Curated annotation (Swiss-Prot):
This is Asparagine--tRNA ligase. One of its GO terms (molecular function) is asparagine-tRNA ligase activity. The keyword tRNA processing does not apply. It comes from Clostridium botulinum (strain Alaska E43 / Type E3). It is found in: Cytoplasm.
Length: 464
């Protein structure tokens, strides 16, 4: 059947199709039939909403159609008719229905509410449910919006390597990449694994960040961004952590921390506004069934200025508040999610930049402040999530950077190329990392990172 019309186009350009014959193809979401007529709700994947098809016993295959299981695929030819007195604005009165593919009667997604936990166990089918159809469409639109924002600003999209020989975060929580025989690896004289015999001739891992490579390109193209998968071997079984996730990492030359925060705020507002404009039906669904205050919160974010406070000031606020925390607050601690959410949800009641963190809890590449105790770093905290963006001005002074690496026991020879950037026309520069899944959680109101990534990879889970 040619000249099929997408359901999205029928909804967006209804007047063009009313009282005319249309062809659609899709999957049956619901079907109910009597002896003389029946109703099918069909979804073709192009739009969040279904379209109703009415069919009667004038069809030659009426009985066969009446007994079709949920999720069977069909093609329909019929007339689009307005239904002003019904729940749906229009319906298709079928003249012909062709069965494209039968579904088994044991199809797991019957017409009832399923828990997110259950849907995770059938990740190959959950995109067909309302919640995940909405989630992954928002994910797609948000990804496009990110590229659109940076391209409109003249940024160069840069592909950084997935396999790396350096640890950007210095945390050591990395997935090793090796072709050595795990049963009998070659050893050095000291009894350690001899990685010179490995595929790359050295110890290599999956990347935790593309930032170090991105800095190389920022110092050539001025403004660049990366957008790709990253990997952390953290054994954190929480709703906010995954072993594989996507990161957006811009780097900007001739820029300081203030420039970095302004870019982060502009980008976040742009992406949220773009999704609100392009996915109104999906966001209305989330607002009704997932997070009752979602639309109000998103509108507030887009229309208000973000707050800013230093780490020291944030600690003072937390110490003086009446709220009991599970983790004690004192200067020098890494703020926990409960602290971040109190600041952004209860105290400031808006997104919040926290700046100038103690150097001990931040990465080696962050620029040392004049007090020699804090670094020019920032975390953007948002209501409902906590930290969503981490950024900093990078340390451009070679002697300071080398001293910091020595403090942390990092070998200069592992980062020789990164250090060499400081020798050839170095300038102040800054950047940040945005966890894409946390952004999707924020935009949709979904509370578990496993539910905003198609096939989540978490400790003990690599199914599908």
């Amino acid at each position: 059947m040619k000249n099929t019309v997408l359901i999205k186009k029928i909804y967006r350009e209804t007047d063009q199709f009313l009282s005319k014959e249309v062809m659609i193809s899709g999957w049956i979401r619901t079907l109910r039939a009597s002896n003389a007529f029946g109703f099918i709700e069909i979804n073709d994947g192009s739009f969040f909403k279904n379209i109703q098809v009415v069919f009667d016993d004038k069809l030659g295959n009426f009985k066969e159609i009446s007994k079709l299981p949920i999720s069977s695929s069909i093609s329909v030819v019929g007339t689009l008719v307005a239904t002003p007195d019904a729940k749906q604005p229009f319906e298709i009165q079928a003249k012909e229905i062709v069965i494209e593919g039968m579904s088994n009667s044991d199809y797991p997604l019957q017409k009832k509410r399923h828990t997110f936990e259950y849907l995770r166990s059938i990740a190959h089918l959950r995109p067909r449910s309302n919640a995940f159809s909405a989630t992954f469409r928002v994910r797609s639109v948000a990804a496009f919006a990110i590229h659109k924002f940076f391209q409109e600003q003249g940024f160069v999209y840069t592909h950084t390597p997935i396999i790396t020989g350096s640890d950007c975060e210095g945390a050591g929580e990395m997935f090793r990449v090796t072709t050595l025989d795990p049963k009998a690896p070659e050893l050095t004289k000291e009894g350690n694994i001899d990685y010179t015999k490995d595929f790359f001739g050295k110890e290599t891992n999956l990347t935790v960040s593309g930032q170090l490579n991105a800095e190389c390109f920022a110092l050539a193209f001025r403004n660049i961004y990366t957008f790709g998968p990253t990997f952390r071997a953290e054994n954190s079984n929480t709703t906010r952590h995954a072993a594989e996730f996507w990161m957006i990492e811009p780097e900007i030359a001739f820029a300081d921390l203030q420039d970095d925060m302004e870019l982060a705020e502009a980008m976040l507002k742009y992406v949220i506004k773009y999704v609100m404009d392009e996915c109104p039906e999906e966001l209305q669904f989330f607002n009704s069934f997932v997070d009752k205050g979602l639309l109000e919160r998103l509108n507030h974010v887009v229309s208000s200025d973000f707050a800013k406070v230093t780490y020291t000031e944030a600690v003072e606020i937390l110490e003086k508040c009446d709220k009991e925390f599970d983790y004690d607050v004192s200067w020098g601690i890494d703020l926990q999610t409960e602290h971040e959410r109190y600041l952004t949800e209860e105290h400031f009641k808006k997104p919040l930049f926290v700046t100038d963190y103690p150097k001990e809890i931040k990465a080696f590449y962050m620029r040392m402040n004049e007090d020699n105790k804090t670094v020019a770093a920032t975390d953007l905290l948002v209501p409902g999530i906590g930290e969503i963006i981490g950024g900093s001005q990078r340390e451009e002074r070679l002697d300071v950077l080398e001293a910091r690496m020595a403090e942390l026991g990092l070998k200069k020879e592992d980062y020789w190329w990164y250090l060499e950037l400081r020798k050839y026309g170095e300038t102040k520069h800054a950047g940040f990392g945005l966890g894409f899944e946390r952004l999707i959680m924020y935009i949709t109101g979904m509370t578990n990172i496993r539910d905003v990534i198609p096939f989540p990879r978490t400790p003990g889970t690599s199914e599908f």
